[in-house]
């Protein structure tokens, strides 16, 4: 049964309530990763495990974020966005409380995987609903502004985690994540609209396979989805590996480690604010081009400085900050163009985008760990530069294949 929903053309107070509730859950899910990373050294010490488990916590979390996306997009298309999203938020709250019962590093990592499943619902269900609820110019502004709120997590997470671990056990963090998730659940219950276009239709494996096959056969969609993954990989690799690089490698304190996150994620927020200001005045492809220069130059600075001296962590931070500004400027527009590169229902398209990105993140973070173990910060930053160059090549192909109407709007 086809259903229709008229996208909002402006941001009233009522229209904003849903994205604010969604971004609170996104914040909880992200800070559940970023805040625990500086505390992972305490976790591995409690379980008598090696520091090699530190980035594995994030790998498991992102692997969980890939696990069910293939199902949740089509499921929410046919069963409704609201019930699927609410079930995901509730599951996240339960798993955050369940981790308090673990007694080994293996159990901890397994529970991190289950918590990561909450990420599936943000992309495959939540953001699909956002894209369907608002017209393009409004949607890009919302996406950019939501990204700023969500990015408070990696900005404040390392600082808050480093501070909290000195005064309370790491388990306290997961109680906080559960409380944030519960508040988000209450808000989404009240405010989330139902935008599913195929609600009431039968969910079948054959139909799912047909839809995914059609989406993945779209070369422009593939270029955009792969580009989105490689764009964010250096940032996520930094979040995962920076406790080892800065605290274990450079012998910095947890407070100094947290301070060095501020310019990187502050630049990311500035990039998103710049995007919100330019949106509607500049074409989306041009915004992506504006972001490309800072991204590649920043990654080159980070790689070049550490090739000169493996302890040049301040220059590395400066380079990653410039890169972060570029990704803040380019990413939201690329998400929008990629999502609408296919005519298949947006739950399925969003799920496919999420699976491709999460696969790149999961494998890439482990490869970044290997690069660091093999070549210290030199290998790590060369890996990030390779990721940025792959993004650049894919984006060039993506923009070249775009419809004429998009190129000139």
Swiss-Prot record:
InterPro entries xrefs: MFS (IPR011701), MFS_dom (IPR020846), MFS_trans_sf (IPR036259)
All ranges on the Cytoplasmic side of the membrane: 1-15, 74-82, 129-144, 190-226, 276-286, 336-347, 400-409
Cellular component, GO, one term: plasma membrane
Main subcellular location: membrane
Membrane topology: Multi-pass membrane protein
Subunit structure, as described in the record: Monomer.
Recorded family membership: Belongs to the major facilitator superfamily. MdfA family.
Protein name in the entry: Multidrug transporter MdfA
Source organism per UniProt: Yersinia pestis bv. Antiqua (strain Angola)
Gene name as annotated: mdfA
């Amino acid at each position: 049964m086809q259903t229709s929903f008229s996208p909002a053309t402006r941001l009233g107070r009522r229209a904003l309530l849903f994205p604010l509730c969604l971004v609170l859950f996104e914040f909880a899910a992200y800070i559940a990763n970023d805040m625990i990373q500086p505390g992972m050294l305490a976790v591995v010490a409690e379980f008598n495990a090696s520091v090699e488990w530190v980035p594995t916590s994030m790998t498991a979390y992102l692997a969980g974020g890939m696990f069910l996306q293939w199902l949740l997009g089509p499921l929410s298309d046919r069963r409704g966005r609201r019930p699927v999203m609410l079930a995901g938020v509730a599951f996240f709250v339960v798993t955050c409380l369940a981790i308090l019962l673990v007694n080994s590093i293996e159990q901890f990592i397994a529970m991190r995987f289950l918590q990561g499943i909450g990420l599936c619902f943000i992309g495959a269900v939540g953001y699909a609903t956002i894209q369907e609820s608002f017209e393009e110019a409004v949607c890009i502004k919302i996406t950019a502004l939501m990204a700023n709120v969500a990015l408070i997590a990696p900005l404040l997470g390392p600082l808050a985690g480093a501070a909290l671990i000195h005064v309370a056990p790491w388990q306290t963090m997961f109680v906080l994540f559960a409380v944030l998730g519960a508040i988000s659940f209450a808000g989404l219950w009240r405010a989330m609209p139902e935008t599913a276009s195929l609600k009431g239709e039968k969910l079948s494996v054959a139909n799912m396979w047909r839809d995914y096959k059609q989406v993945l056969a779209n070369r422009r969609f593939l270029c955009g989805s792969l580009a989105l993954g490689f764009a964010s990989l250096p940032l996520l690799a930094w979040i995962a590996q920076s406790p080892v690089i800065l605290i274990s490698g450079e012998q910095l304190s947890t407070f100094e480690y947290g301070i060095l996150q501020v310019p990187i994620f502050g630049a990311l927020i500035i990039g998103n604010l710049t995007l919100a200001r330019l949106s509607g005045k500049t074409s989306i492809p041009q915004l992506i081009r504006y972001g490309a220069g800072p991204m590649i130059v920043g990654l080159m600075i980070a790689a070049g400085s550490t090739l000169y001296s493996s302890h040049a962590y301040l220059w590395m931070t400066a380079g990653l900050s410039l890169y972060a500004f570029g990704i803040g400027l380019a990413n939201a527009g690329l998400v929008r163009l990629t999502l609408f590169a296919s005519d298949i229902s947006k739950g399925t398209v969003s799920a496919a985008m999420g699976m491709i990105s999460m696969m790149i993140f999961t494998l890439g973070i482990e490869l970044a760990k290997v690069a660091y173990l093999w070549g210290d910060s030199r290998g790590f930053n060369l890996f990030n530069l390779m990721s940025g160059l792959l993004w650049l090549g894919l984006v060039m192909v993506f923009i070249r294949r775009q419809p004429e109407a998009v190129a000139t709007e």
